[in-house]
Protein backbone atom coordinates (compact mmCIF):
# COMPACT_ATOMS: atom_id res chain seq x y z
CA UNK A 1 0.00 0.00 0.00
CA UNK A 2 2.86 2.39 0.73
CA UNK A 3 4.24 2.00 -2.80
CA UNK A 4 0.83 2.88 -4.23
CA UNK A 5 0.82 6.04 -2.13
CA UNK A 6 4.27 7.03 -3.37
CA UNK A 7 3.27 6.63 -7.01
CA UNK A 8 -0.23 8.06 -6.74
CA UNK A 9 -0.48 10.98 -4.29
CA UNK A 10 -4.13 11.50 -5.26
CA UNK A 11 -4.96 8.08 -3.81
CA UNK A 12 -3.05 9.04 -0.68
CA UNK A 13 -5.32 12.03 -0.26
CA UNK A 14 -8.52 10.08 -0.94
CA UNK A 15 -7.56 7.32 1.54
CA UNK A 16 -6.30 9.58 4.32
CA UNK A 17 -8.03 9.60 7.75
CA UNK A 18 -11.45 11.21 7.48
CA UNK A 19 -11.40 11.17 3.66
CA UNK A 20 -14.19 9.47 1.66
CA UNK A 21 -12.09 6.35 1.03
CA UNK A 22 -10.28 6.06 4.34
CA UNK A 23 -8.93 2.54 4.81
CA UNK A 24 -8.89 0.85 8.23
CA UNK A 25 -8.06 -2.58 9.65
CA UNK A 26 -11.04 -4.62 10.86
CA UNK A 27 -11.66 -8.20 11.93
CA UNK A 28 -14.17 -9.80 9.59
CA UNK A 29 -15.28 -13.43 9.96
CA UNK A 30 -12.18 -14.08 12.04
CA UNK A 31 -9.81 -12.50 9.51
CA UNK A 32 -8.02 -9.17 9.78
CA UNK A 33 -8.82 -7.20 6.63
CA UNK A 34 -8.34 -3.71 5.29
CA UNK A 35 -11.72 -2.20 4.52
CA UNK A 36 -13.10 1.21 3.69
CA UNK A 37 -14.16 2.83 6.95
CA UNK A 38 -17.32 4.10 5.27
CA UNK A 39 -18.34 0.68 3.92
CA UNK A 40 -22.10 0.25 4.45
CA UNK A 41 -23.48 -2.75 6.30
CA UNK A 42 -24.96 -4.36 3.17
CA UNK A 43 -25.39 -3.83 -0.55
CA UNK A 44 -28.94 -2.73 0.24
CA UNK A 45 -27.49 0.45 1.75
CA UNK A 46 -26.11 1.25 -1.72
CA UNK A 47 -29.61 0.78 -3.11
CA UNK A 48 -31.15 3.01 -0.44
CA UNK A 49 -28.64 5.80 -0.99
CA UNK A 50 -29.34 5.68 -4.73
CA UNK A 51 -33.04 6.37 -4.15
CA UNK A 52 -32.14 10.00 -3.49
CA UNK A 53 -31.35 10.41 -7.20
CA UNK A 54 -35.11 10.46 -7.74
CA UNK A 55 -36.21 11.40 -11.25
CA UNK A 56 -32.72 11.37 -12.75
CA UNK A 57 -32.42 8.96 -15.64
CA UNK A 58 -30.79 5.70 -14.62
CA UNK A 59 -31.10 3.18 -17.47
CA UNK A 60 -31.37 3.83 -21.20
CA UNK A 61 -32.29 0.81 -23.32
CA UNK A 62 -33.53 1.33 -26.88
CA UNK A 63 -36.54 3.64 -26.49
CA UNK A 64 -36.95 3.00 -22.76
CA UNK A 65 -35.63 5.61 -20.32
CA UNK A 66 -36.00 4.47 -16.70
CA UNK A 67 -35.55 6.90 -13.80
CA UNK A 68 -34.17 5.97 -10.39
CA UNK A 69 -37.62 6.41 -8.86
CA UNK A 70 -39.27 4.08 -11.36
CA UNK A 71 -36.45 1.55 -11.12
CA UNK A 72 -36.74 1.19 -7.36
CA UNK A 73 -40.54 1.12 -7.49
CA UNK A 74 -40.29 -1.98 -9.67
CA UNK A 75 -37.45 -3.55 -7.67
CA UNK A 76 -39.30 -3.02 -4.38
CA UNK A 77 -42.42 -4.66 -5.81
CA UNK A 78 -40.39 -7.66 -6.95
CA UNK A 79 -38.71 -8.03 -3.54
CA UNK A 80 -42.06 -8.01 -1.77
CA UNK A 81 -43.55 -10.51 -4.23
CA UNK A 82 -40.66 -12.93 -3.78
CA UNK A 83 -40.99 -12.81 0.01
CA UNK A 84 -44.77 -12.78 0.39
CA UNK A 85 -45.98 -14.75 -2.62
CA UNK A 86 -43.06 -17.12 -3.20
CA UNK A 87 -41.99 -17.30 0.45
CA UNK A 88 -38.34 -16.79 -0.43
CA UNK A 89 -36.13 -17.37 2.59
CA UNK A 90 -32.96 -15.47 3.43
CA UNK A 91 -29.96 -17.09 1.77
CA UNK A 92 -31.89 -19.02 -0.88
CA UNK A 93 -30.63 -18.91 -4.47
CA UNK A 94 -32.55 -17.12 -7.21
CA UNK A 95 -31.11 -17.27 -10.72
CA UNK A 96 -31.09 -14.50 -13.33
CA UNK A 97 -30.86 -15.76 -16.90
CA UNK A 98 -31.35 -12.86 -19.30
CA UNK A 99 -29.44 -10.75 -21.77
CA UNK A 100 -28.50 -7.24 -20.60
CA UNK A 101 -31.68 -5.22 -20.06
CA UNK A 102 -33.38 -3.09 -17.36
CA UNK A 103 -35.27 -6.17 -16.12
CA UNK A 104 -31.96 -7.90 -15.36
CA UNK A 105 -30.92 -5.04 -13.08
CA UNK A 106 -34.37 -4.84 -11.46
CA UNK A 107 -34.16 -8.58 -10.81
CA UNK A 108 -30.76 -8.28 -9.13
CA UNK A 109 -31.87 -5.55 -6.74
CA UNK A 110 -35.17 -7.31 -6.10
CA UNK A 111 -33.47 -10.58 -5.18
CA UNK A 112 -30.80 -9.07 -2.93
CA UNK A 113 -33.28 -6.82 -1.09
CA UNK A 114 -35.44 -9.89 -0.45
CA UNK A 115 -32.48 -11.59 1.24
CA UNK A 116 -31.85 -13.96 -1.64
CA UNK A 117 -28.54 -14.80 -3.28
CA UNK A 118 -28.54 -13.65 -6.90
CA UNK A 119 -27.16 -16.45 -9.09
CA UNK A 120 -25.89 -14.91 -12.32
CA UNK A 121 -26.24 -17.36 -15.20
CA UNK A 122 -24.21 -16.95 -18.37
CA UNK A 123 -27.06 -16.22 -20.78
CA UNK A 124 -24.81 -17.00 -23.76
CA UNK A 125 -24.15 -20.53 -22.59
CA UNK A 126 -25.51 -23.73 -24.06
CA UNK A 127 -28.59 -25.15 -22.36
CA UNK A 128 -26.69 -28.00 -20.71
CA UNK A 129 -24.37 -25.51 -18.99
CA UNK A 130 -27.33 -23.39 -17.88
CA UNK A 131 -29.04 -26.43 -16.36
CA UNK A 132 -25.82 -27.42 -14.60
CA UNK A 133 -25.50 -23.93 -13.13
CA UNK A 134 -29.04 -24.08 -11.72
CA UNK A 135 -28.36 -27.46 -10.14
CA UNK A 136 -24.92 -26.58 -8.77
CA UNK A 137 -26.22 -23.40 -7.10
CA UNK A 138 -29.31 -25.02 -5.51
CA UNK A 139 -31.49 -22.47 -7.29
CA UNK A 140 -35.11 -22.42 -6.09
CA UNK A 141 -36.49 -19.83 -8.52
CA UNK A 142 -35.56 -18.48 -11.96
CA UNK A 143 -36.00 -15.04 -13.49
CA UNK A 144 -35.44 -15.32 -17.23
CA UNK A 145 -36.33 -13.86 -20.58
CA UNK A 146 -38.53 -15.86 -22.92
CA UNK A 147 -35.70 -17.23 -25.06
CA UNK A 148 -33.74 -18.66 -22.11
CA UNK A 149 -36.78 -19.96 -20.25
CA UNK A 150 -37.90 -21.78 -23.39
CA UNK A 151 -34.52 -23.52 -23.54
CA UNK A 152 -34.70 -24.43 -19.86
CA UNK A 153 -38.26 -25.76 -20.04
CA UNK A 154 -37.43 -27.79 -23.17
CA UNK A 155 -34.57 -29.36 -21.20
CA UNK A 156 -36.79 -30.38 -18.30
CA UNK A 157 -36.36 -27.46 -15.90
CA UNK A 158 -39.49 -27.34 -13.73
CA UNK A 159 -38.40 -24.60 -11.32
CA UNK A 160 -40.93 -21.82 -10.74
CA UNK A 161 -40.04 -18.89 -12.95
CA UNK A 162 -40.67 -15.23 -13.61
CA UNK A 163 -40.49 -14.55 -17.34
CA UNK A 164 -39.64 -11.16 -18.78
CA UNK A 165 -41.75 -10.96 -21.94
CA UNK A 166 -45.07 -9.27 -22.71
CA UNK A 167 -47.83 -11.57 -24.02
CA UNK A 168 -45.53 -14.52 -23.46
CA UNK A 169 -46.29 -18.11 -24.40
CA UNK A 170 -45.76 -18.79 -20.70
CA UNK A 171 -48.81 -16.73 -19.68
CA UNK A 172 -50.81 -19.94 -19.35
CA UNK A 173 -47.99 -21.88 -17.68
CA UNK A 174 -48.98 -22.47 -14.05
CA UNK A 175 -45.32 -22.65 -13.02
CA UNK A 176 -44.43 -19.31 -14.62
CA UNK A 177 -45.41 -15.71 -13.91
CA UNK A 178 -45.09 -12.71 -16.21
CA UNK A 179 -42.55 -10.17 -14.97
CA UNK A 180 -44.78 -7.13 -15.47
CA UNK A 181 -47.62 -8.68 -13.48
CA UNK A 182 -45.72 -8.53 -10.18
CA UNK A 183 -44.56 -4.92 -10.48
CA UNK A 184 -47.72 -3.52 -8.88
CA UNK A 185 -47.16 -5.46 -5.66
CA UNK A 186 -47.02 -3.33 -2.51
CA UNK A 187 -43.47 -2.97 -1.12
CA UNK A 188 -42.36 -4.70 2.08
CA UNK A 189 -42.97 -2.79 5.29
CA UNK A 190 -40.01 -4.38 7.09
CA UNK A 191 -36.70 -4.83 5.26
CA UNK A 192 -34.77 -8.10 5.51
CA UNK A 193 -31.91 -7.81 8.00
CA UNK A 194 -28.65 -8.25 6.09
CA UNK A 195 -25.01 -7.80 7.08
CA UNK A 196 -21.63 -7.73 5.37
CA UNK A 197 -21.10 -11.43 6.14
CA UNK A 198 -24.26 -12.54 4.30
CA UNK A 199 -23.91 -13.86 0.76
CA UNK A 200 -25.11 -11.55 -2.01
CA UNK A 201 -24.28 -13.24 -5.31
CA UNK A 202 -22.90 -16.26 -7.07
CA UNK A 203 -20.93 -15.75 -10.27
CA UNK A 204 -19.57 -18.58 -12.36
CA UNK A 205 -15.96 -19.01 -13.34
CA UNK A 206 -15.30 -19.24 -17.06
CA UNK A 207 -15.12 -23.02 -17.00
CA UNK A 208 -12.53 -23.20 -19.78
CA UNK A 209 -11.22 -26.38 -18.17
CA UNK A 210 -14.12 -28.47 -16.91
CA UNK A 211 -17.44 -27.48 -15.37
CA UNK A 212 -17.81 -23.88 -14.25
CA UNK A 213 -17.79 -23.30 -10.49
CA UNK A 214 -20.00 -20.85 -8.58
CA UNK A 215 -17.92 -18.29 -6.68
CA UNK A 216 -19.76 -17.02 -3.59
CA UNK A 217 -19.53 -13.27 -3.09
CA UNK A 218 -20.57 -11.72 0.23
CA UNK A 219 -22.08 -8.28 0.72
CA UNK A 220 -18.65 -7.07 1.86
CA UNK A 221 -17.04 -8.46 -1.31
CA UNK A 222 -19.48 -6.58 -3.54
CA UNK A 223 -19.35 -3.36 -1.49
CA UNK A 224 -15.54 -3.32 -1.52
CA UNK A 225 -15.41 -3.86 -5.28
CA UNK A 226 -17.90 -1.05 -5.94
CA UNK A 227 -16.04 1.36 -3.68
CA UNK A 228 -12.75 0.48 -5.40
CA UNK A 229 -14.24 1.45 -8.76
CA UNK A 230 -15.85 4.56 -7.33
CA UNK A 231 -12.46 5.59 -5.91
CA UNK A 232 -10.86 5.10 -9.33
CA UNK A 233 -13.50 7.39 -10.85
CA UNK A 234 -12.78 9.99 -8.20
CA UNK A 235 -9.07 9.94 -9.01
CA UNK A 236 -9.91 10.84 -12.62
CA UNK A 237 -11.70 13.99 -11.47
CA UNK A 238 -8.82 14.94 -9.18
CA UNK A 239 -6.32 14.44 -12.01
CA UNK A 240 -8.34 16.75 -14.24
CA UNK A 241 -8.37 19.33 -11.45
CA UNK A 242 -4.57 19.12 -11.26
CA UNK A 243 -4.27 19.29 -15.04
CA UNK A 244 -6.33 22.49 -15.26
CA UNK A 245 -5.05 23.88 -11.95
CA UNK A 246 -8.51 24.33 -10.50
CA UNK A 247 -10.71 22.97 -7.72
CA UNK A 248 -12.32 19.53 -7.89
CA UNK A 249 -15.74 21.15 -7.43
CA UNK A 250 -15.17 23.30 -10.52
CA UNK A 251 -14.33 20.22 -12.59
CA UNK A 252 -17.48 18.46 -11.38
CA UNK A 253 -19.60 21.47 -12.30
CA UNK A 254 -18.29 21.54 -15.86
CA UNK A 255 -18.10 17.80 -16.53
CA UNK A 256 -21.01 16.07 -18.24
CA UNK A 257 -23.02 13.90 -15.80
CA UNK A 258 -21.50 10.43 -15.31
CA UNK A 259 -22.70 7.99 -17.93
CA UNK A 260 -21.40 4.51 -18.68
CA UNK A 261 -21.86 2.33 -21.76
CA UNK A 262 -22.61 -1.24 -20.69
CA UNK A 263 -20.51 -3.46 -22.94
CA UNK A 264 -19.74 -6.26 -20.49
CA UNK A 265 -22.45 -8.83 -19.78
CA UNK A 266 -24.09 -8.25 -16.41
CA UNK A 267 -23.37 -11.84 -15.37
CA UNK A 268 -19.69 -10.87 -15.47
CA UNK A 269 -18.23 -9.13 -12.42
CA UNK A 270 -17.11 -6.13 -14.50
CA UNK A 271 -20.65 -5.57 -15.75
CA UNK A 272 -22.16 -6.10 -12.30
CA UNK A 273 -19.91 -4.01 -10.07
CA UNK A 274 -17.84 -1.72 -12.29
CA UNK A 275 -20.70 -0.49 -14.48
CA UNK A 276 -24.10 -1.28 -12.92
CA UNK A 277 -23.60 -0.86 -9.18
CA UNK A 278 -20.87 1.79 -9.35
CA UNK A 279 -22.96 4.04 -11.58
CA UNK A 280 -25.83 3.56 -9.15
CA UNK A 281 -23.70 4.86 -6.26
CA UNK A 282 -22.77 8.08 -8.11
CA UNK A 283 -26.17 8.78 -9.64
CA UNK A 284 -24.86 7.90 -13.08
CA UNK A 285 -26.70 6.84 -16.20
CA UNK A 286 -26.22 3.44 -17.84
CA UNK A 287 -26.73 2.94 -21.56
CA UNK A 288 -27.54 -0.67 -22.46
CA UNK A 289 -26.96 -2.20 -25.89
CA UNK A 290 -28.92 -5.22 -27.14
CA UNK A 291 -25.90 -6.60 -28.96
CA UNK A 292 -22.41 -5.42 -29.74
CA UNK A 293 -22.23 -3.00 -32.66
CA UNK A 294 -19.26 -0.63 -32.81
CA UNK A 295 -21.02 1.96 -34.95
CA UNK A 296 -24.02 2.04 -32.62
CA UNK A 297 -21.68 2.30 -29.62
CA UNK A 298 -20.06 5.41 -31.12
CA UNK A 299 -23.46 6.90 -31.92
CA UNK A 300 -24.51 6.33 -28.30
CA UNK A 301 -21.33 7.96 -26.98
CA UNK A 302 -22.18 11.05 -29.02
CA UNK A 303 -25.94 11.07 -28.34
CA UNK A 304 -25.94 10.20 -24.62
CA UNK A 305 -22.67 12.02 -23.78
CA UNK A 306 -21.09 8.87 -22.36
CA UNK A 307 -18.19 9.66 -20.04
CA UNK A 308 -16.77 6.22 -19.23
CA UNK A 309 -15.99 3.45 -21.67
CA UNK A 310 -14.65 0.11 -20.51
CA UNK A 311 -14.15 -2.84 -22.80
CA UNK A 312 -11.90 -5.62 -24.01
CA UNK A 313 -9.32 -5.25 -26.81
CA UNK A 314 -11.73 -6.58 -29.44
CA UNK A 315 -14.41 -3.96 -28.70
CA UNK A 316 -11.85 -1.16 -28.61
CA UNK A 317 -10.47 -2.19 -32.01
CA UNK A 318 -13.98 -2.42 -33.44
CA UNK A 319 -14.70 1.15 -32.38
CA UNK A 320 -11.35 2.47 -33.59
CA UNK A 321 -11.97 0.95 -37.02
CA UNK A 322 -15.55 2.29 -37.18
CA UNK A 323 -14.34 5.80 -36.35
CA UNK A 324 -12.36 5.81 -39.59
CA UNK A 325 -15.62 5.67 -41.56
CA UNK A 326 -17.57 8.48 -39.82
CA UNK A 327 -16.81 11.47 -37.62
CA UNK A 328 -18.28 11.39 -34.11
CA UNK A 329 -18.21 13.84 -31.23
CA UNK A 330 -16.49 11.81 -28.53
CA UNK A 331 -15.42 14.74 -26.39
CA UNK A 332 -17.58 13.63 -23.44
CA UNK A 333 -15.34 10.60 -22.79
CA UNK A 334 -13.06 11.22 -19.83
CA UNK A 335 -12.20 7.59 -19.05
CA UNK A 336 -11.32 4.69 -21.35
CA UNK A 337 -10.18 1.46 -19.75
CA UNK A 338 -9.23 -1.98 -20.95
CA UNK A 339 -9.86 -5.36 -19.35
CA UNK A 340 -10.25 -9.04 -20.13
CA UNK A 341 -6.74 -9.39 -21.51
CA UNK A 342 -3.74 -7.14 -21.96
CA UNK A 343 -3.79 -4.39 -24.58
CA UNK A 344 -0.99 -4.24 -27.10
CA UNK A 345 1.16 -1.13 -27.30
CA UNK A 346 -0.38 -0.43 -30.70
CA UNK A 347 -3.90 -0.48 -29.22
CA UNK A 348 -2.98 1.89 -26.39
CA UNK A 349 -1.40 4.29 -28.88
CA UNK A 350 -4.53 4.31 -31.04
CA UNK A 351 -6.85 4.79 -28.05
CA UNK A 352 -4.76 7.68 -26.75
CA UNK A 353 -4.78 9.43 -30.13
CA UNK A 354 -8.50 8.86 -30.75
CA UNK A 355 -9.85 9.92 -27.35
CA UNK A 356 -7.61 12.88 -26.39
CA UNK A 357 -9.87 13.99 -23.50
CA UNK A 358 -9.90 10.57 -21.87
CA UNK A 359 -7.59 9.13 -19.26
CA UNK A 360 -6.46 5.61 -20.07
CA UNK A 361 -6.61 2.85 -17.51
CA UNK A 362 -6.34 -0.88 -16.97
CA UNK A 363 -6.58 -3.39 -14.18
CA UNK A 364 -6.35 -7.02 -13.21
CA UNK A 365 -8.85 -9.16 -11.38
CA UNK A 366 -11.03 -12.22 -11.62
CA UNK A 367 -14.45 -13.50 -10.63
CA UNK A 368 -13.03 -14.93 -7.40
CA UNK A 369 -11.74 -11.50 -6.35
CA UNK A 370 -14.96 -9.62 -7.19
CA UNK A 371 -13.13 -7.79 -9.94
CA UNK A 372 -10.01 -5.69 -9.84
CA UNK A 373 -7.21 -6.18 -7.33
CA UNK A 374 -4.87 -3.84 -9.19
CA UNK A 375 -5.62 -0.86 -11.39
CA UNK A 376 -4.25 2.45 -12.53
CA UNK A 377 -5.44 5.31 -14.70
CA UNK A 378 -4.14 8.55 -16.09
CA UNK A 379 -0.55 9.44 -15.26
CA UNK A 380 -0.16 6.48 -12.90
CA UNK A 381 -1.09 4.09 -15.71
CA UNK A 382 1.08 5.78 -18.35
CA UNK A 383 4.13 5.31 -16.10
CA UNK A 384 3.80 1.57 -16.71
CA UNK A 385 1.32 0.98 -19.57
CA UNK A 386 2.27 -2.69 -19.97
CA UNK A 387 1.43 -3.36 -16.32
CA UNK A 388 -1.89 -4.37 -14.79
CA UNK A 389 -1.79 -1.32 -12.55
CA UNK A 390 -0.95 -0.70 -8.91
CA UNK A 391 -2.04 -3.08 -6.18
CA UNK A 392 -5.22 -1.71 -4.62
CA UNK A 393 -5.21 -0.72 -0.94
CA UNK A 394 -7.87 -3.32 -0.11
CA UNK A 395 -5.72 -6.31 -0.94
CA UNK A 396 -2.37 -7.92 -0.26
CA UNK A 397 -0.53 -9.61 -3.10
CA UNK A 398 2.44 -11.94 -2.85
CA UNK A 399 4.29 -13.78 -5.59
CA UNK A 400 5.37 -17.34 -4.76
CA UNK A 401 7.64 -19.85 -6.48
CA UNK A 402 7.01 -23.55 -7.05
CA UNK A 403 8.42 -24.24 -3.58
CA UNK A 404 5.83 -21.95 -1.98
CA UNK A 405 8.37 -19.34 -0.94
CA UNK A 406 7.85 -15.66 -1.73
CA UNK A 407 9.75 -14.42 -4.78
CA UNK A 408 11.92 -11.27 -4.83
CA UNK A 409 10.67 -8.17 -6.64
CA UNK A 410 10.94 -8.50 -10.40
CA UNK A 411 10.86 -12.31 -10.40
CA UNK A 412 7.81 -14.16 -11.68
CA UNK A 413 5.75 -16.65 -9.74
CA UNK A 414 2.14 -17.45 -8.91
CA UNK A 415 0.03 -14.46 -7.87
CA UNK A 416 -1.64 -14.96 -4.47
CA UNK A 417 -4.23 -12.55 -3.09
CA UNK A 418 -5.98 -11.91 0.20
CA UNK A 419 -8.33 -9.14 1.18
CA UNK A 420 -11.87 -7.85 1.42
CA UNK A 421 -12.74 -8.63 -2.19
CA UNK A 422 -11.69 -12.31 -2.16
CA UNK A 423 -14.63 -14.72 -2.50
CA UNK A 424 -16.00 -16.86 0.31
CA UNK A 425 -15.32 -20.03 -1.67
CA UNK A 426 -16.87 -22.16 -4.41
CA UNK A 427 -20.44 -23.14 -3.59
CA UNK A 428 -20.68 -26.79 -2.50
CA UNK A 429 -17.13 -27.38 -3.75
CA UNK A 430 -15.01 -27.70 -0.57
CA UNK A 431 -12.23 -29.61 -2.35
CA UNK A 432 -11.99 -27.06 -5.16
CA UNK A 433 -12.06 -24.25 -2.61
CA UNK A 434 -9.25 -25.87 -0.62
CA UNK A 435 -7.11 -26.07 -3.77
CA UNK A 436 -7.13 -22.30 -4.24
CA UNK A 437 -7.67 -20.95 -0.70
CA UNK A 438 -4.66 -21.68 1.52
CA UNK A 439 -4.04 -19.94 4.84
CA UNK A 440 -6.29 -17.07 3.81
CA UNK A 441 -4.56 -16.57 0.44
CA UNK A 442 -6.30 -17.04 -2.90
CA UNK A 443 -3.93 -18.85 -5.29
CA UNK A 444 -4.94 -17.46 -8.66
CA UNK A 445 -3.12 -19.76 -11.06
CA UNK A 446 -1.83 -16.63 -12.78
CA UNK A 447 1.88 -15.96 -13.13
CA UNK A 448 3.19 -12.44 -12.60
CA UNK A 449 5.61 -10.24 -10.74
CA UNK A 450 5.74 -6.98 -8.78
CA UNK A 451 8.21 -4.22 -9.55
CA UNK A 452 9.85 -1.87 -7.06
CA UNK A 453 7.15 0.77 -7.53
CA UNK A 454 4.28 -1.59 -6.72
CA UNK A 455 3.06 -2.26 -10.25
CA UNK A 456 1.77 -5.74 -10.98
CA UNK A 457 2.71 -7.42 -14.26
CA UNK A 458 0.86 -10.46 -15.59
CA UNK A 459 3.13 -12.98 -17.28
CA UNK A 460 0.66 -15.77 -17.98
CA UNK A 461 -1.70 -18.40 -16.68
CA UNK A 462 0.17 -21.32 -15.12
CA UNK A 463 -2.00 -23.49 -17.36
CA UNK A 464 -1.14 -21.35 -20.42
CA UNK A 465 2.55 -22.12 -20.30
CA UNK A 466 4.24 -24.11 -23.06
CA UNK A 467 7.18 -26.42 -22.38
CA UNK A 468 9.15 -26.67 -25.60
CA UNK A 469 12.42 -28.57 -25.66
CA UNK A 470 12.55 -28.34 -21.86
CA UNK A 471 12.16 -24.55 -21.84
CA UNK A 472 9.19 -22.73 -20.33
CA UNK A 473 7.45 -20.30 -22.70
CA UNK A 474 4.74 -18.01 -21.32
CA UNK A 475 2.14 -17.18 -23.96
CA UNK A 476 1.43 -13.75 -22.45
CA UNK A 477 5.08 -12.75 -22.87
CA UNK A 478 4.98 -13.71 -26.55
CA UNK A 479 1.71 -11.82 -27.04
CA UNK A 480 3.00 -8.74 -25.27
CA UNK A 481 6.30 -8.67 -27.15
CA UNK A 482 5.01 -9.36 -30.65
CA UNK A 483 1.93 -7.21 -29.98
CA UNK A 484 4.19 -4.16 -30.08
CA UNK A 485 4.65 -4.60 -33.85
CA UNK A 486 2.74 -1.82 -35.57
CA UNK A 487 0.98 -4.19 -37.96
CA UNK A 488 -0.48 -6.46 -35.28
CA UNK A 489 -4.02 -5.72 -34.16
CA UNK A 490 -4.70 -8.76 -31.93
CA UNK A 491 -2.60 -11.79 -31.13
CA UNK A 492 -3.00 -15.15 -29.41
CA UNK A 493 -0.17 -17.58 -28.67
CA UNK A 494 -0.78 -21.25 -27.96
CA UNK A 495 1.00 -24.58 -27.98
CA UNK A 496 0.41 -27.80 -29.89
CA UNK A 497 1.96 -31.24 -29.43
CA UNK A 498 5.29 -31.90 -31.11
CA UNK A 499 7.00 -35.30 -31.08
CA UNK A 500 10.49 -33.86 -30.78
CA UNK A 501 10.00 -30.76 -28.62
CA UNK A 502 7.02 -31.86 -26.57
CA UNK A 503 5.16 -28.71 -27.60
CA UNK A 504 5.71 -26.06 -30.25
CA UNK A 505 4.60 -22.44 -30.21
CA UNK A 506 2.02 -21.15 -32.68
CA UNK A 507 0.68 -17.59 -32.90
CA UNK A 508 -2.58 -16.47 -34.50
CA UNK A 509 -2.97 -12.79 -35.28
CA UNK A 510 -5.11 -10.23 -37.01
CA UNK A 511 -3.52 -7.30 -38.82
CA UNK A 512 -4.33 -3.64 -39.29
CA UNK A 513 -2.07 -3.32 -42.34
CA UNK A 514 -0.80 -5.75 -44.99
CA UNK A 515 2.26 -7.60 -43.66
CA UNK A 516 4.01 -10.80 -44.69
CA UNK A 517 4.62 -13.48 -42.07
CA UNK A 518 8.31 -13.38 -43.02
CA UNK A 519 8.48 -9.81 -41.74
CA UNK A 520 6.83 -10.86 -38.48
CA UNK A 521 9.29 -13.71 -38.10
CA UNK A 522 12.24 -11.34 -38.56
CA UNK A 523 10.74 -9.10 -35.86
CA UNK A 524 10.24 -12.08 -33.53
CA UNK A 525 13.86 -13.17 -33.94
CA UNK A 526 15.02 -9.65 -33.09
CA UNK A 527 12.91 -9.46 -29.94
CA UNK A 528 12.77 -13.01 -28.58
CA UNK A 529 15.14 -15.77 -27.54
CA UNK A 530 15.54 -18.44 -30.21
CA UNK A 531 13.42 -21.01 -28.38
CA UNK A 532 10.58 -18.48 -28.03
CA UNK A 533 10.28 -17.75 -31.76
CA UNK A 534 6.95 -19.13 -33.09
CA UNK A 535 7.01 -22.18 -35.34
CA UNK A 536 4.05 -20.91 -37.36
CA UNK A 537 2.02 -17.75 -37.88
CA UNK A 538 -1.69 -17.87 -38.65
CA UNK A 539 -3.28 -14.76 -40.14
CA UNK A 540 -7.00 -14.45 -39.39
CA UNK A 541 -9.64 -11.79 -39.98
CA UNK A 542 -11.36 -12.36 -36.65
CA UNK A 543 -11.23 -14.36 -33.44
CA UNK A 544 -13.85 -16.13 -31.35
CA UNK A 545 -14.19 -14.77 -27.82
CA UNK A 546 -15.47 -15.98 -24.48
CA UNK A 547 -18.23 -14.02 -22.73
CA UNK A 548 -15.55 -12.13 -20.81
CA UNK A 549 -13.72 -11.06 -23.96
CA UNK A 550 -10.86 -13.55 -23.94
CA UNK A 551 -9.77 -15.18 -27.20
CA UNK A 552 -10.85 -18.83 -27.33
CA UNK A 553 -7.48 -20.48 -27.83
CA UNK A 554 -8.85 -24.02 -27.80
CA UNK A 555 -10.69 -23.26 -31.05
CA UNK A 556 -7.51 -21.87 -32.60
CA UNK A 557 -5.62 -24.97 -31.52
CA UNK A 558 -8.27 -27.28 -32.99
CA UNK A 559 -8.35 -25.35 -36.28
CA UNK A 560 -4.56 -25.53 -36.55
CA UNK A 561 -4.46 -29.27 -35.86
CA UNK A 562 -7.31 -29.92 -38.31
CA UNK A 563 -5.45 -27.95 -40.98
CA UNK A 564 -2.26 -29.94 -40.31
CA UNK A 565 -4.13 -33.22 -40.79
CA UNK A 566 -5.44 -32.06 -44.13
Please place each PLM-identified region on the residue numbering:
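Conserved pre-ATP/AMP-binding loop-to-beta segment of ANL
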Residues: 186-204, 211, 252-259
Amino acid sequence: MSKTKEIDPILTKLMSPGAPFEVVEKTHSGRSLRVFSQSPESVCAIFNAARTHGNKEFIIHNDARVTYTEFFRRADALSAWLVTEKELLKGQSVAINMKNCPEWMIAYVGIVQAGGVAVLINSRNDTESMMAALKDSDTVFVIADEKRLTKLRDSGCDLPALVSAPDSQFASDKNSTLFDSVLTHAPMTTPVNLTQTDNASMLFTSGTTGRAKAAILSHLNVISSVMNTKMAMETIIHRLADQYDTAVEVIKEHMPPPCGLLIYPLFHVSGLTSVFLTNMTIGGKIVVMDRWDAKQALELVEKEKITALSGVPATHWDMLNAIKETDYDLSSLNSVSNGGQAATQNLLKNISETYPNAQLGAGYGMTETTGAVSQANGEAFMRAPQSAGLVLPMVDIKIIGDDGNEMPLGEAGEICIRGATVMQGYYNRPEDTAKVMKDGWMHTGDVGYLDEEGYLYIVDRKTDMIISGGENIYCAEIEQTLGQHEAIKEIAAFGVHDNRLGEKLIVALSLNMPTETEQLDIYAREKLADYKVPHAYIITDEFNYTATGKIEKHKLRKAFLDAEKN
